[in-house]
């Protein structure tokens, strides 16, 4: 779902270090919970979930004994604002989980950008992407909308659905994801209101 420096764990960690989140400044190591490419996930039941019955959570987060979150409170165009619930819910979701929260549909492929490499075909567990005439296409009947193909594409040719979740649905899905992560586990949250930015950081 995310492109650029948050597309895979190594560059994500480098970006964190450059922004002051390193073991030297925080005393904690950084682990990207859903693994190198966002595919290491645990399926977690959402107690009483209305929009999400089973959340796709980064596996390393579900292996933790306790959740301690340090949140930068800020504005968000998609959700209005972001704090602990957004940090836990969206941040804890695997790539497929983030896709589920952000979108109600299925990805599509830009033929102009596609080079026919087959990365999307190899990552898909459902056989939805196919290569025809040296270009990938998605069989929407087979696609489950998990978004793994988005992260696998080296050319950013696989795009999320144009119609995203409404703000109300997105906020509710994030809250349900946060509930799936926190339910029945000890947790502690600190939110800082400093350098409030108008967009997600």
Question: What is each model feature region?
Answer:
Residues 2-201:
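Extended, low-polarity segments enriched in aliphatic/aromatic residues
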């Amino acid at each position: 779902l995310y492109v650029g420096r948050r597309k895979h764990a190594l560059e994500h960690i480098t970006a964190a270090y450059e922004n002051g989140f390193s073991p030297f400044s925080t005393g904690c190591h950084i682990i990207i919970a859903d693994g190198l490419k966002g595919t290491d996930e645990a399926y977690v039941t959402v107690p009483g979930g209305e929009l999400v019955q089973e959340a796709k959570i980064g596996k390393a987060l579900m292996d933790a004994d306790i959740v301690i979150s340090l949140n930068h409170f800020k504005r968000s165009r998609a959700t209005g604002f972001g704090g602990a619930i957004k940090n836990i819910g969206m941040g804890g979701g695997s790539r497929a989980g983030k896709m589920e929260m952000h979108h109600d549909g299925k990805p599509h492929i830009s033929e102009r950008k596609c080079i026919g490499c087959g990365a999307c075909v190899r990552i898909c567990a459902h056989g939805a992407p196919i290569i025809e005439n040296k270009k990938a296409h998605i069989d929407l009947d087979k696609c489950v909308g998990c978004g793994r193909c988005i992260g696998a594409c080296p050319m950013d040719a696989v795009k999320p659905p144009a119609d995203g979740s409404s703000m109300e649905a997105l906020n509710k899905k994030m809250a349900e994801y946060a509930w799936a992560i926190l339910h029945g586990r000890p947790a502690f949250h600190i939110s800082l209101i400093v350098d409030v930015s108008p967009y997600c950081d």
